[in-house]
A protein has these predicted regions:
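Catalytic active-site module of serine/aspartate enzymes centered on a nucleophile-bearing elbow/loop
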Residues: 252-301
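A short glycine-rich, Lys/Arg-flanked "PGG" loop and its adjoining helix->strand segment in the class I
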Residues: 496-508
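Class I (Rossmann-like) S-adenosyl-L-methionine-dependent methyltransferase catalytic domain
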Residues: 374, 382, 389-393, 416-425, ...
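Class I SAM-dependent methyltransferase Rossmann-like catalytic core
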Residues: 332-399
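Short alpha-helix in the alpha/beta-hydrolase fold that links the catalytic acid
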Residues: 216, 230-239, 495
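Conserved alpha/beta-hydrolase
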Residues: 49-73
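Short beta-strand/loop motif that positions the catalytic acidic residue
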Residues: 214, 220-222
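Catalytic nucleophile-loop/oxyanion-hole region of alpha/beta-hydrolase
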Residues: 39-42, 68-103
């Protein structure tokens, strides 16, 4: 079938180029999606369709931002997170435009493309059939000593800049034709922006460390003589994968361009078998809904909840850390609120949202500014922005369907993140805010009055985990919101009470916005040093839920995820699901 060249739009409105080859036998239900390595483009990946020789699959390959025919400065993207979001947009576009469900899609990705796909598998938990990852660039070999540190320092000094690839074509593949085509291809982007290169390292480190969250069937191909990337992170990634179906093939003598090597048939034999086996069986999914009882996140939370010997080095360190926070609360307003109400309280959350450093003196303001700029609080503020996007998206869908917008938020804190998302031209028909804390309810009602929203917004003291509190709601909610609540409780049976409540209250075609925290780089600091507002839980110990675990719990309540947002550090997700 002839190849077609088209464009699709990402969520920020950028049009990215892609190539499409329909299935040779006329089939329209399965697809293989190809992601090129760094510097290259889709034109250098479509040969994979010929090598595989599958006539019953459609083939898609994109040009990533800043590559090939796609827009953007060559070798650049707004961020790694944006590029990963583009991957999700591409798969969703294929589903909507061609009617091919994710569970009937195989993804094949190489080098940098494999890092983007791995991050996507971790952060978005898509239900694809399988993935083949060839020589993922989890750690690029920078032969100059301290090169990464130097790039970071230089970037802080002069902002973003570009570095050219040192890799010659004859170090990528033994195949002379591939070498020549690489050297003479005008679409090759030989430079890469430093913020993308450094972002690639950071995303890769996070995904390799937390690979147990990925349960997609994965085949990993490792080039045995790779001059470009390190092997150890590739093996670490494989060893930690949560996939029940996974394969690793080390290809002796292969250079970095695994799929374009001279003897690539060795790799393609394994790829054909793996892909056929996956599609000859039903979609394989790992049930994670009992992860609060056993598994990696339960073990991690139990370890964080285990007291440290006071006289041990770690025990002494965290005791000193706690003392310094208590001392700092004399001057820093944020630390004071955290110490008095809990660092996971609605009052703390509202203070973080406002993001205005305060203190009893100049030193206190400086401490407060440092405190508010912590990576977790930055993620919280981005979560607020993403919730606003989700509210606007869901409201628009309801209006388009001719339905009213009746909002129910079951754990609102002070309600600021919902109220800030309301605008005069898109005001919902009604908004019901709830929280179990009388302090939060009082503060929220004050905010409502300040904004003159009493005719639209109400705020009541209600327990989100009591199923009876979702019965006989009039008017019935068409948009439910639960933000930041489930992250505070490890027990899945408990949070299912609220999700089932939403499922009973919201009619078919309504929407649910929910959040998750699949990753956090400061879990131990939070558990050892920060206090909680929850009764009987003085220490703030969190059990992380992978995105797949959270999605599965939401599905049990009758919802299906249709969109997702995530911050650049991969800490907090915001998802939009529709009631089926």
């Amino acid at each position: 079938m002839p190849e077609q060249q088209k464009y699709f739009s990402t969520q920020d409105g950028t049009s990215l180029f892609y190539r499409y080859r329909p299935a040779a036998d006329g089939s329209s239900d399965k697809a293989i999606v190809l992601f090129h390595r760094g510097h290259e483009h889709s034109g250098r990946m479509m040969f994979v369709a010929d090598e595989l020789g599958f006539d019953d699959f459609a083939y898609f390959a994109w040009d990533a931002r800043g590559h090939g025919y796609s827009p953007g400065e060559r070798g650049d993207s707004p961020s790694i997170g944006t590029s990963v979001s583009d991957v999700d947009d591409f798969i969703r576009y294929i589903q909507s435009e061609y009617g091919i469900k994710p569970e009937n899609i195989c993804v094949i990705a190489q080098s940098v493309g494999a890092v983007l796909v791995s991050t996507w598998l971790h952060d978005y938990a898509p239900k694809i059939r399988c993935a083949v990852l060839a020589s993922p660039a989890f750690k690029v070999k920078l032969y100059v000593p301290f090169a990464r540190t130097g790039l970071k320092i230089k970037q802080k000094w002069r902002g973003n800049f570009f570095v050219n690839s040192y890799v010659k074509a004859h170090y990528l593949t033994h195949n002379v034709e591939r070498q020549k085509s690489y050297d003479n291809d005008p679409l090759i982007a030989r430079a890469i922006s430093v913020h993308i290169l450094l972002g690639l390292y950071e995303a890769a480190e996070r995904v390799v460390a937390d690979a147990q969250a990925i349960t997609t069937p994965v085949q990993l191909l490792i080039s045995g003589s790779d001059w470009v990337v390190h092997h150890k992170p590739q093996h670490d990634f494989y060893n930690r994968l949560g996939s029940h179906i996974k394969e690793r093939h080390i290809l002796p003598g292969f250079y970095h361009d695994t799929l374009g090597e001279q003897n690539r048939e060795i790799a393609f034999v394994e790829m054909r078998r793996f892909i056929r086996e996956r599609f000859n069986q039903p979609l394989q999914q790992v049930d994670l809904t009992q992860s609060h009882l056993f598994g990696d996140s339960r073990r991690e939370a139990d370890e964080l909840a285990t007291p440290l010997p006071v006289c041990s080095p770690r025990g002494a360190f965290w005791a000193t850390y706690r003392a310094s926070l208590k001392l700092g609360s004399r001057w820093s307003e944020g630390l004071r609120i955290g110490q008095e109400t809990g660092f996971d309280s609605g009052s703390t959350l509202d203070y973080v949202y406002r993001n205005q450093p305060q203190g009893s003196n100049a030193f206190g303001v400086w401490v407060d500014k440092y405190y508010l700029n912590a990576i977790g609080w930055r993620g919280i503020r981005q979560r607020k922005v993403n919730i606003g996007k989700a509210i606007q998206t869901a409201s628009a869908k309801l209006r388009e369907a001719g339905k009213p917008v009746h909002v129910l938020d079951i754990a609102s804190g002070h309600g600021r993140y919902v109220l800030d998302a309301l605008t005069a031209d898109t005001l919902p028909d009604s908004v019901r805010l709830r929280d179990y804390s009388p302090i939060n309810v009082e503060a929220g009602r004050k905010l409502i009055a300040e904004r003159g929203l009493q005719n639209t917004v109400t705020f009541n003291e209600v327990n989100a985990y009591d199923r009876a509190n979702y019965h006989d709601l009039q008017p019935r909610p068409t948009l439910g919101i639960v933000s930041g609540l489930h992250e505070l409780f490890a027990d899945n049976d408990l949070i299912l009470n609220s999700l089932y409540g939403f499922g009973e209250a919201i009619e078919t075609g309504g929407y649910l916005i929910y959040t998750d925290q699949p990753w956090h780089p400061q879990l131990e600091m939070i558990a050892r040093a920060l206090t909680s507002h929850k009764a009987g839980s003085p220490n703030w110990v969190m059990r992380r839920r992978s995105q797949q675990e959270m999605d599965q719990l939401v599905e049990k309540a009758g919802f299906e995820k249709i969109h997702q947002w995530i911050d650049e550090d991969g800490i907090f997700t915001v998802s939009l699901a529709v009631k089926k």
